[in-house]
Protein backbone atom coordinates (compact mmCIF):
# COMPACT_ATOMS: atom_id res chain seq x y z
CA UNK A 1 0.00 0.00 0.00
CA UNK A 2 1.37 3.45 -0.90
CA UNK A 3 1.10 6.47 1.33
CA UNK A 4 -1.66 8.22 -0.61
CA UNK A 5 -4.57 6.56 1.30
CA UNK A 6 -2.94 7.43 4.62
CA UNK A 7 -2.53 11.06 3.59
CA UNK A 8 -6.14 11.07 2.42
CA UNK A 9 -7.14 9.83 5.88
CA UNK A 10 -5.28 12.74 7.49
CA UNK A 11 -7.38 15.10 5.37
CA UNK A 12 -10.54 13.13 6.19
CA UNK A 13 -9.90 13.48 9.94
CA UNK A 14 -9.37 17.23 9.55
CA UNK A 15 -12.68 17.54 7.70
CA UNK A 16 -14.38 15.36 10.33
CA UNK A 17 -13.07 17.56 13.14
CA UNK A 18 -14.34 20.65 11.34
CA UNK A 19 -17.66 18.85 11.03
CA UNK A 20 -17.98 18.74 14.83
CA UNK A 21 -17.75 22.53 14.90
CA UNK A 22 -20.07 23.04 11.93
CA UNK A 23 -22.67 20.69 13.42
CA UNK A 24 -22.48 22.20 16.91
CA UNK A 25 -23.20 25.65 15.49
CA UNK A 26 -25.90 24.51 13.06
CA UNK A 27 -27.96 22.57 15.60
CA UNK A 28 -28.04 25.52 17.97
CA UNK A 29 -31.12 26.50 15.94
CA UNK A 30 -31.86 23.59 13.59
CA UNK A 31 -33.62 20.46 14.92
CA UNK A 32 -30.92 17.71 15.09
CA UNK A 33 -32.73 15.08 13.00
CA UNK A 34 -33.79 17.68 10.42
CA UNK A 35 -30.18 18.82 10.20
CA UNK A 36 -28.89 15.27 9.59
CA UNK A 37 -31.67 14.45 7.13
CA UNK A 38 -31.33 17.55 4.94
CA UNK A 39 -27.52 17.62 5.18
CA UNK A 40 -27.04 14.06 3.94
CA UNK A 41 -29.80 14.10 1.33
CA UNK A 42 -28.30 17.23 -0.24
CA UNK A 43 -24.83 15.67 -0.17
CA UNK A 44 -26.18 12.53 -1.87
CA UNK A 45 -27.84 14.65 -4.57
CA UNK A 46 -24.56 16.48 -5.19
CA UNK A 47 -22.70 13.18 -5.66
CA UNK A 48 -25.37 11.48 -7.80
CA UNK A 49 -24.44 13.14 -11.14
CA UNK A 50 -20.76 12.38 -10.50
CA UNK A 51 -21.54 8.73 -9.79
CA UNK A 52 -23.81 8.44 -12.81
CA UNK A 53 -21.27 9.92 -15.22
CA UNK A 54 -18.06 8.33 -13.89
CA UNK A 55 -18.98 4.83 -12.70
CA UNK A 56 -21.17 1.92 -13.83
CA UNK A 57 -24.37 1.55 -11.78
CA UNK A 58 -24.21 -1.01 -8.96
CA UNK A 59 -26.13 -4.28 -9.07
CA UNK A 60 -29.20 -4.80 -6.91
CA UNK A 61 -27.17 -6.84 -4.41
CA UNK A 62 -24.56 -4.09 -4.19
CA UNK A 63 -27.26 -1.47 -3.67
CA UNK A 64 -28.71 -3.48 -0.79
CA UNK A 65 -25.27 -3.83 0.82
CA UNK A 66 -24.60 -0.11 0.44
CA UNK A 67 -28.05 0.70 1.86
CA UNK A 68 -27.37 -1.51 4.89
CA UNK A 69 -24.06 0.24 5.44
CA UNK A 70 -25.85 3.58 5.13
CA UNK A 71 -28.41 2.51 7.73
CA UNK A 72 -25.59 1.87 10.20
CA UNK A 73 -24.06 5.24 9.37
CA UNK A 74 -27.41 6.98 9.77
CA UNK A 75 -28.06 5.39 13.16
CA UNK A 76 -24.59 6.34 14.38
CA UNK A 77 -24.87 9.95 13.22
CA UNK A 78 -28.35 10.46 14.66
CA UNK A 79 -27.07 9.23 18.02
CA UNK A 80 -23.99 11.43 17.64
CA UNK A 81 -25.84 14.63 16.79
CA UNK A 82 -28.16 14.03 19.75
CA UNK A 83 -25.09 13.73 21.98
CA UNK A 84 -23.37 16.92 20.81
CA UNK A 85 -26.63 18.86 21.13
CA UNK A 86 -26.48 18.09 24.88
CA UNK A 87 -22.72 18.50 25.48
CA UNK A 88 -20.10 21.28 25.27
CA UNK A 89 -17.09 18.96 25.72
CA UNK A 90 -16.54 18.10 22.07
CA UNK A 91 -13.00 16.84 22.72
CA UNK A 92 -14.29 14.32 25.25
CA UNK A 93 -16.99 13.19 22.86
CA UNK A 94 -14.42 12.68 20.13
CA UNK A 95 -12.39 10.56 22.58
CA UNK A 96 -15.34 8.22 23.18
CA UNK A 97 -16.00 7.91 19.45
CA UNK A 98 -12.34 7.10 18.77
CA UNK A 99 -12.15 4.34 21.39
CA UNK A 100 -14.94 2.51 19.60
CA UNK A 101 -13.25 3.13 16.25
CA UNK A 102 -10.29 1.13 17.57
CA UNK A 103 -12.66 -1.82 17.87
CA UNK A 104 -13.49 -1.72 14.15
CA UNK A 105 -10.59 -4.04 13.18
CA UNK A 106 -11.83 -6.57 15.74
CA UNK A 107 -15.32 -6.34 14.25
CA UNK A 108 -13.83 -6.92 10.78
CA UNK A 109 -11.90 -9.90 12.15
CA UNK A 110 -15.07 -11.42 13.59
CA UNK A 111 -17.34 -10.70 10.63
CA UNK A 112 -15.04 -10.96 7.61
CA UNK A 113 -12.03 -12.94 8.96
CA UNK A 114 -9.76 -9.97 8.24
CA UNK A 115 -7.20 -10.45 11.00
CA UNK A 116 -5.45 -7.20 12.05
CA UNK A 117 -1.75 -7.09 11.19
CA UNK A 118 1.15 -6.73 13.58
CA UNK A 119 1.24 -2.94 13.16
CA UNK A 120 -2.22 -2.70 14.74
CA UNK A 121 -1.19 -4.54 17.91
CA UNK A 122 2.08 -2.59 18.14
CA UNK A 123 0.50 0.86 17.82
CA UNK A 124 -2.67 0.07 19.78
CA UNK A 125 -1.12 0.66 23.27
CA UNK A 126 0.37 3.97 22.08
CA UNK A 127 -2.98 5.06 20.67
CA UNK A 128 -4.92 4.12 23.81
CA UNK A 129 -2.38 5.92 26.04
CA UNK A 130 -2.70 9.02 23.88
CA UNK A 131 -6.48 8.96 24.02
CA UNK A 132 -6.46 8.52 27.80
CA UNK A 133 -4.21 11.56 28.16
CA UNK A 134 -6.44 13.55 25.82
CA UNK A 135 -9.36 12.87 28.18
CA UNK A 136 -7.32 13.30 31.39
CA UNK A 137 -9.17 16.38 32.68
CA UNK A 138 -12.60 15.20 31.63
CA UNK A 139 -15.25 14.83 34.30
CA UNK A 140 -16.66 11.39 33.57
CA UNK A 141 -19.90 11.81 35.43
CA UNK A 142 -22.99 9.90 34.44
CA UNK A 143 -24.84 12.04 31.94
CA UNK A 144 -27.30 11.41 29.17
CA UNK A 145 -24.90 12.74 26.53
CA UNK A 146 -22.30 10.15 27.63
CA UNK A 147 -24.70 7.30 26.86
CA UNK A 148 -25.57 8.85 23.48
CA UNK A 149 -21.86 9.09 22.62
CA UNK A 150 -21.27 5.46 23.67
CA UNK A 151 -24.18 4.22 21.56
CA UNK A 152 -23.02 6.28 18.57
CA UNK A 153 -19.45 5.05 18.97
CA UNK A 154 -20.41 1.38 19.08
CA UNK A 155 -22.50 1.71 15.93
CA UNK A 156 -19.73 3.65 14.19
CA UNK A 157 -17.14 0.97 14.95
CA UNK A 158 -19.29 -1.67 13.25
CA UNK A 159 -20.08 0.65 10.35
CA UNK A 160 -16.41 1.37 9.65
CA UNK A 161 -15.63 -2.35 9.34
CA UNK A 162 -18.61 -2.91 7.02
CA UNK A 163 -17.81 0.22 4.99
CA UNK A 164 -14.22 -0.83 4.38
CA UNK A 165 -15.30 -4.36 3.38
CA UNK A 166 -17.86 -3.14 0.83
CA UNK A 167 -15.48 -0.48 -0.51
CA UNK A 168 -13.44 -3.31 -2.03
CA UNK A 169 -16.23 -4.33 -4.42
CA UNK A 170 -18.60 -1.36 -4.88
CA UNK A 171 -17.68 1.72 -6.92
CA UNK A 172 -16.66 4.42 -4.41
CA UNK A 173 -18.89 7.28 -5.54
CA UNK A 174 -21.96 5.05 -5.74
CA UNK A 175 -21.21 3.55 -2.33
CA UNK A 176 -20.81 7.02 -0.82
CA UNK A 177 -23.93 8.36 -2.53
CA UNK A 178 -26.17 5.48 -1.42
CA UNK A 179 -24.88 5.62 2.16
CA UNK A 180 -25.48 9.36 2.39
CA UNK A 181 -28.96 9.00 0.90
CA UNK A 182 -29.93 6.32 3.44
CA UNK A 183 -28.62 8.46 6.29
CA UNK A 184 -30.59 11.43 4.98
CA UNK A 185 -33.79 9.40 4.69
CA UNK A 186 -33.44 8.13 8.26
CA UNK A 187 -32.86 11.64 9.56
CA UNK A 188 -35.80 13.04 7.61
CA UNK A 189 -38.12 10.28 8.85
CA UNK A 190 -37.08 10.87 12.47
CA UNK A 191 -37.63 14.61 12.04
CA UNK A 192 -41.15 14.09 10.68
CA UNK A 193 -42.02 11.74 13.54
CA UNK A 194 -40.45 13.50 16.52
CA UNK A 195 -39.49 17.12 15.78
CA UNK A 196 -40.98 20.43 14.71
CA UNK A 197 -39.46 23.27 12.75
CA UNK A 198 -38.67 26.24 15.05
CA UNK A 199 -41.47 28.81 14.96
CA UNK A 200 -39.02 31.71 15.20
CA UNK A 201 -37.25 30.55 12.05
CA UNK A 202 -33.53 30.13 11.52
CA UNK A 203 -30.99 32.98 11.37
CA UNK A 204 -28.96 33.58 8.20
CA UNK A 205 -25.63 32.74 9.87
CA UNK A 206 -26.84 29.22 10.68
CA UNK A 207 -27.30 28.49 6.99
CA UNK A 208 -23.61 29.23 6.45
CA UNK A 209 -22.70 26.55 9.00
CA UNK A 210 -25.22 24.23 7.35
CA UNK A 211 -23.68 24.78 3.90
CA UNK A 212 -20.21 24.05 5.30
CA UNK A 213 -21.57 20.84 6.83
CA UNK A 214 -23.04 19.72 3.51
CA UNK A 215 -20.15 20.59 1.20
CA UNK A 216 -17.06 20.11 3.37
CA UNK A 217 -17.92 17.79 6.27
CA UNK A 218 -20.23 15.48 4.30
CA UNK A 219 -19.86 15.44 0.50
CA UNK A 220 -16.08 15.88 0.32
CA UNK A 221 -15.26 14.03 3.53
CA UNK A 222 -17.21 10.83 2.86
CA UNK A 223 -16.18 10.67 -0.79
CA UNK A 224 -12.51 10.87 0.22
CA UNK A 225 -13.10 8.38 3.05
CA UNK A 226 -14.55 5.76 0.70
CA UNK A 227 -11.62 6.16 -1.71
CA UNK A 228 -9.13 5.79 1.15
CA UNK A 229 -10.88 2.75 2.64
CA UNK A 230 -10.80 0.95 -0.70
CA UNK A 231 -6.98 0.98 -0.58
CA UNK A 232 -6.17 0.24 3.07
CA UNK A 233 -6.88 -2.21 5.87
CA UNK A 234 -9.50 -1.63 8.55
CA UNK A 235 -6.71 -1.50 11.14
CA UNK A 236 -4.86 1.25 9.29
CA UNK A 237 -8.09 3.23 8.88
CA UNK A 238 -9.07 2.88 12.55
CA UNK A 239 -5.65 4.03 13.77
CA UNK A 240 -5.57 6.95 11.35
CA UNK A 241 -9.01 8.10 12.51
CA UNK A 242 -7.55 8.65 15.99
CA UNK A 243 -6.31 11.96 14.62
CA UNK A 244 -9.90 13.23 14.66
CA UNK A 245 -10.07 13.86 18.45
CA UNK A 246 -6.74 15.71 18.28
CA UNK A 247 -8.05 18.16 15.68
CA UNK A 248 -11.43 18.32 17.44
CA UNK A 249 -9.79 19.15 20.77
CA UNK A 250 -7.81 21.96 19.15
CA UNK A 251 -10.92 23.43 17.53
CA UNK A 252 -12.94 23.02 20.73
CA UNK A 253 -10.21 24.85 22.65
CA UNK A 254 -10.10 27.69 20.12
CA UNK A 255 -13.86 28.17 19.76
CA UNK A 256 -15.37 26.97 23.05
CA UNK A 257 -12.54 27.41 25.56
CA UNK A 258 -12.21 23.70 26.38
CA UNK A 259 -9.19 23.37 28.74
CA UNK A 260 -5.94 22.28 27.07
CA UNK A 261 -3.30 21.22 29.61
CA UNK A 262 0.01 19.42 29.51
CA UNK A 263 -1.55 15.96 29.71
CA UNK A 264 -3.77 16.60 26.70
CA UNK A 265 -0.81 17.95 24.74
CA UNK A 266 1.14 14.79 25.63
CA UNK A 267 -1.81 12.67 24.51
CA UNK A 268 -1.96 14.51 21.19
CA UNK A 269 1.77 13.90 20.80
CA UNK A 270 1.36 10.15 21.35
CA UNK A 271 -1.45 9.95 18.81
CA UNK A 272 0.68 11.84 16.29
CA UNK A 273 3.67 9.60 17.10
CA UNK A 274 1.91 6.61 15.58
CA UNK A 275 1.85 8.27 12.14
CA UNK A 276 5.49 7.47 11.24
CA UNK A 277 4.88 3.88 12.38
CA UNK A 278 1.86 3.59 10.09
CA UNK A 279 3.72 5.17 7.18
CA UNK A 280 6.54 2.67 7.68
CA UNK A 281 4.15 -0.29 7.80
CA UNK A 282 2.38 1.00 4.69
CA UNK A 283 5.56 0.37 2.70
CA UNK A 284 5.85 -3.17 4.01
CA UNK A 285 2.34 -4.54 3.76
CA UNK A 286 -0.41 -4.54 1.16
CA UNK A 287 -4.03 -4.78 2.44
CA UNK A 288 -6.08 -7.86 1.78
Residue ranges and their predicted role:
Residues 7, 40, 206-208, 242-288:
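C-terminal-most transmembrane helix of multi-pass membrane proteins
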Residues 15-20, 51-97, 105, 133, ...:
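Specific transmembrane alpha-helical segments of multi-pass solute transporters/efflux pumps
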Residues 21-24, 44-48, 103-110, 139-195, ...:
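Transmembrane alpha-helical segments that form core, pore/gating elements
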Residues 34-45, 73, 81-114, 152, ...:
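Specific alpha-helical transmembrane segments that line the substrate/conduction pathway
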Residues 36-38, 93-99, 162-185, 218-254:
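Helix-helix packing/entry segments at the starts of transmembrane helices
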Residues 47, 68-69, 73, 116-136, ...:
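Hydrophobic transmembrane alpha-helices of multi-pass small-molecule transport proteins
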Amino acid sequence: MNRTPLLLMVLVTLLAAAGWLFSKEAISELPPAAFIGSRFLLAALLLLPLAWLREPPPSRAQMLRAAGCGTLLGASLLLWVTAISQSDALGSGAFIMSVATLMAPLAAWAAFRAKPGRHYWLTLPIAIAGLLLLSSSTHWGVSLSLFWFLAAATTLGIQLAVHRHFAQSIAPTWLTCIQLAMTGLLGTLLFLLTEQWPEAGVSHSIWGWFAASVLIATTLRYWLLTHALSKMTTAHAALMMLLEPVWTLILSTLFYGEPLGGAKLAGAGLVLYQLPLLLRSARLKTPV
